[in-house]
Amino acid sequence: MEEIQRYLQPDRSQQHNFLYPLIFQEYIYALAHDHGLNRNRSVLLENPGYNNKFSLLIVKRLITRMYQQNHFLISTNDSNKNAFLGCNKSLYSQMISEGFAFIVEIPFSLRLISSLSSFEGKKIFKSHNLRSIHSTFPFLEDNFSHLNYVLDILIPYPVHLEILVQTLRYWVKDASSLHLLRFFLHEYWNLNSLITSKKPGYSFSKKNQRFFFFLYNSYVYECESTFVFLRNQSSRLRSTSFGALLERINFYGKMERLVEVFTKDFQVTLWLFKDPFMHYVRYQEKSILASKGTFLLMNKWKFYLVNFWQCHFSLCFHTGRIHINQLSNHSRDFMGYLSSVRLNPSMLRSQMLENSFLINNAIKKFDTLVPIIPLIGSLAKANFCTVLGHPISKPVWSDLSDSDIIDRFGRICRNLFHYYSGSSKKXTLYRIKYILRLSCARTLARKHKSTVRTFLKRSGSELLEEFLTSEEQVLSLTFPRASSSLWGVYRSRIWYLDIFCINXLANYQ
């Protein structure tokens, strides 16, 4: 990164104009290869012979070959042939896109470094706490119980390819890089591997996730520019490629600027954007905009967002992708949890002098529940049970050792308990534990050609210990005869700051 900074440093006024030559630097592909190890398998791992073949001459030839292709003469048989150095059409495009994805992130990385360096002598909180999915739920728990209505929003799709290029023009001012980006987009659009519009959200190529996640986050960042007028109560999860602190700095900077503009030119509509009880949360393609206002106010917000996205992105955005729901009468699926705000009635006895009377109070409480039916559907899809929730064996794992089979089932169970530790009612999780434990026993019994009853008698205690969660292990070791109050602490909601992605079984959509 220091070498890249020196490369871009000579002229600060044009520091974004030198990205294209970086494509021909060999160390860029080494850096992209190292970053690929942390996310997904790199093309260099799948093709070990290419790690010594990245050079300026080869990259120039690859780009030339890409631009000189006659797409009208390519048949289905030609797409499987080796075009250059033993790689096919999609593979050598991927070789350059890996390096290109790393290069276009440089302006964002340098901006983040400069933002962090501006906090001289100040202690900055750890940014990974902001990255945690569970960090959003305490925010919802503290604020949503006081609100009335919520807008459930799906990010508009599909977007025109040229809009993606124009979005990056504000950050990457290198015409050559933008031309190459435009070529990549049209190339993958023709291969039907960039964006799939058959379902809500986006489906990315598995081999170029870093590149496509960067484009998607840039697009979402532009979509969220309409929310810059929200106050600092807003909570936003980090995008995949952007730093959380960088997003907040840009967010509040735009907020102050837009408020000044509306104060000067749009006095009449300013009240709509200065709602002090407006909160916004987003993860993946879903967004939540909640307010203490009336239904009429939320309806104005709905049509404002529809008109803004239609005009700004030149797409047909249907109003059906934004739903107005009352918090007290609606449950929403968000990040694998089924969350709602319900009225919790309580009876209080009051006494004034010699007279006593009862008072009924209804307190709003934010609930987070485990969606049992979709979760059982995910287990059934993974062949752990039937669609009705009856445990079955996993024949694919029958060739593994007994310890590996028990460890795999136990790890899945512990991960689910860890992810759903914030559930208000954890009785559902014990049904999931029962399914996984009995599925494990059936798999082992199938392997040893015996019955489940016989196997459980032989190794029941060992199997039980493997399925204990971390909280249960601590309580059972520290307090062998734990009181009901201690187990009540375990049954309470616990939010962890080390969860950065949705559990694979919880992400059932």
Curated annotation (Swiss-Prot):
- What keywords is this UniProt entry annotated with? Chloroplast, mRNA processing, Plastid, RNA-binding, tRNA processing
One of its GO biological process terms is:
RNA splicing
Annotated Gene Ontology cellular components are: chloroplast
Broad class of the protein's primary localization: plastid
- One short Pfam name that applies is Intron_maturas2
State its location(s).
Plastid, Chloroplast
Can you provide one Gene Ontology molecular function annotated for this UniProt record? RNA binding
Similarity section: Belongs to the intron maturase 2 family. MatK subfamily.
- Provide the function of this protein: Usually encoded in the trnK tRNA gene intron. Probably assists in splicing its own and other chloroplast group II introns.
User: HAMAP family, from UniProt?
Assistant: MatK (MF_01390)
Q: Which PANTHER family match?
A: MATURASE K
Name this polypeptide is given = Maturase K
Species of the source: Nicotiana rustica
**What are the leading ranks of the lineage?**
Eukaryota, Viridiplantae, Streptophyta, Embryophyta, Tracheophyta
